[in-house]
Amino acid sequence: MGNKLGRKRQVVEERYTKPQGLYVNKDVDVKKLRKLIVESKLAPCYPGDDESCHDLEECPICFLYYPSLNRSRCCMKSICTECFLQMKNPNSARPTQCPFCKTPNYAVEYRGVKSKEEKGIEQVEEQRVIEAKIRMRQKEMQDDEEKMQKRLESCSSSTSAMTGEMEYGSTSAISYNSLMDDGEIAPSQNASVVRQHSRPRGNREDEVDVDLEELMVMEAIWLSVQETGTQRNSASGEITSSRQYVTDNHSYVSSPPRVTPIVEPATPSSSSGGLSCAISALAERQMVGESSSHNHNHNVNVSSYSMLPGNCDSYYDIEQEVDGIDNHHHHRHHYEMGETGSSNSYVSSYMTGEGFHNFPPPPPLVIVPESFEEQMMMAMAVSMAEVHATTTCAPTEVTWQ
């Protein structure tokens, strides 16, 4: 009668009632600790084992295996007594938080060794946690793959757009070049190929500032050029009509006309690179055409005229050839006249050489100024060419025999 039923206390050995030296903690009250262990409020301080066993539990703090562990009241997580004493500092005024769920006022209780049912429940919970972690990881990987796919699609679309633009630009450039080549290259049968690249027009409003005074000066120059041209035509018609009649052989020898080389100073032009060469060639062409219109039987032995815009080397070579031919015939004429003193020897020596050459007229050079500025520049160049021709070209003496 009067006996009280209760749980039988576990008999704990004395050596398990004090710390085993896992941590160096001098603030532990050994007497109080022993009392709590004897009263089964804390788990005994068993020595931890490194190897796992089916009867042992692992402490998630020190990762050692013990026969029994304490349990957190907040989250029911297991922890050994020495780790709990390390977390729960008795001299600290701040409340201790749970190392697992961060709940304040951390406290534990000892329930003894876990039963099979409790171990099964813990395993199920652990499995759920693992599955949840796996699902989260898979979702993160799927999101990363979707982002990468979107980036690849955007990059491929931008690359295809750039490729299309490049192809369109290349085809348009090829078509433009083919059109330019077809328009610029004009093949001829008896003359060389003449190329004249069209210069693109630009906005010259900022570069060219032509006032009224300059326009009047240019107009006066143009009028003077026209007057000089008419005078030059009349003078050249009288000079170039020279024929040497030979009464003995009833034949005549035509003296070749004097072609005056016109060399313009090679100064760079802001309007076009080859404009000065083109203007010089046009001026010479006009002079040669005017002289040949009065004398149909006198032609200059010029094989071909080929002039590229911006390059006057071939033009100067042609002039030097023409000058050399004239000088050769002129010196030969005077030398033979002085040696024999008669026209018969000159005629015979001149006629015994190569026969008369029918020199084809040079092909026409079509140069059309594009703007008023180029027209004024052409007028000035023609005027300079005419003045240079009148000052440097001496009239050829005509001797009738």
Curated annotation (Swiss-Prot):
Disruption phenotype: Increased organ size, biomass, and seed size and weight. GO terms for biological process: protein ubiquitination; regulation of organ growth; regulation of seed growth. It comes from the Eukaryota. The keyword Transferase applies. Keywords: Developmental protein, Metal-binding, Transferase, Ubl conjugation pathway, Zinc, Zinc-finger. Pathway: Protein modification; protein ubiquitination. Residues 139-164 are annotated as: Disordered. It catalyses: S-ubiquitinyl-[E2 ubiquitin-conjugating enzyme]-L-cysteine + [acceptor protein]-L-lysine = [E2 ubiquitin-conjugating enzyme]-L-cysteine + N(6)-ubiquitinyl-[acceptor protein]-L-lysine. Interacts with DA1 (via C-terminus). This is E3 ubiquitin-protein ligase DA2. It comes from Arabidopsis thaliana.
